């Protein structure tokens, strides 16, 4: 018996070429990298430690101008750059084909333009008008330290309140007399 099979069917199946296996497999797999024959268990590149596992892999680069994928298999970094420059000089590179930015909220497909997007003041991400409020999108960051502004607001409120009541509210601050009262009676 030369390659595999049984005495009755000598051409049926082949032995796995993994050194630790040698299983007679009736439906063998031929590796497209190293061209050896393997059983079901050893058919993947990783399972038989294929030395040419990246043989069939493909790489692409995305053009920043038009968002077209350009195959760059087998090129080094310098070659990829020249390939992209060649594409940009050709008539195929059209900036109108570039994918427009969309709202980052899940399942929202609204295209963000200059007129319909707002940046969240808490997380700094651009959203469409429908999802502009922190409650409408999953806002990742909490309110940035606004203790200084809230204390100033409280001071202004207390000053206005003291003007209204004509009392110092225990603060002992002098109130300017040229400010007009907040409520007028006629």
From Swiss-Prot:
Zinc finger regions, AN1-type: 10-58, 97-147
Keyword presence, Zinc: yes
MF annotations from Gene Ontology: zinc ion binding
Low complexity bias: start-end ranges: 172-186
Binding positions (Zn(2+) 1): 16, 21, 39, 42
Residues annotated as binding Zn(2+) 2: 31, 34, 48, 50
Chain's gene name: SAP12
Binding site for Zn(2+) 3: 103, 108, 128, 131
Residues annotated as binding Zn(2+) 4: 120, 123, 137, 139
Species whose genome carries this gene: Arabidopsis thaliana (Mouse-ear cress)
Name of one Pfam family that matches: zf-AN1
Annotated region (Disordered), positions in chain: 167-186
Keywords: Metal-binding, Repeat, Zinc, Zinc-finger
Function: May be involved in environmental stress response.
Official protein name in the record: Zinc finger AN1 domain-containing stress-associated protein 12
InterPro entries: AN1-like_Znf (IPR035896), Znf_AN1 (IPR000058)
Domain of life: Eukaryota
GO biological process, one term: response to abscisic acid
PROSITE patterns cross-referenced by the UniProt entry: ZF_AN1
